[in-house]
Swiss-Prot record:
Species assigned in the record: Rickettsia rickettsii (strain Sheila Smith)
Name the UniProt record assigns to this protein: Nucleoid-associated protein A1G_07310
Annotated GO CC locations: bacterial nucleoid; cytosol
Record function comment: Binds to DNA and alters its conformation. May be involved in regulation of gene expression, nucleoid organization and DNA protection.
Keyword Iron-sulfur: no
Localization annotation: Cytoplasm, Nucleoid
UniProtKB keywords: Cytoplasm, DNA-binding
Record-linked SUPFAM superfamilies: YbaB-like (SSF82607)
Top-level taxon of origin: Bacteria
Keyword Amino-acid biosynthesis recorded: no
Cited Pfam families: YbaB_DNA_bd
């Protein structure tokens, strides 16, 4: 039979690791690039866009559609990095257990 006190200590330890991982993710920054670096998006671990950098060569009316696409690609690239880091950080906090694909933490 499993010792209840030992189980409780493990649960508390896991909870502490989860809180630490959440804080680490909330403070992290992820850079997504598109068009060979012509567009760069910096997003927080919460998925909020912090900064968008656009090369001046794209600031022409005839480049509008391409610019919109590059911003989308750069943001998605930053979001993918955030999601991967989140999975890895939380897996460590959960002693190697993997979260289901697409699972999002509430932060």
């Amino acid at each position: 039979m499993v010792n209840f006190n030992q189980f409780l200590k493990q649960a508390q330890s896991m909870q502490k690791k989860m809180q630490e991982a959440q804080e680490q993710m909330a403070n992290a920054r992820y850079t997504g690039k598109a068009g060979g670096g012509l567009v760069e998006v910096i997003a927080t671990g919460k998925g909020e866009v912090e900064k968008i950098s656009i090369d001046e060569s794209l600031l022409k009316a005839e480049e509008k559609e391409m610019l919109e696409d590059l911003i989308k690609v750069a943001f998605n690239n930053a979001q993918q990095k955030c999601d991967e880091d989140s999975q890895n950080s939380l897996s460590g906090a959960l002693n190697g257990m993997r979260l289901p694909p697409g699972f999002k933490m509430p932060f």
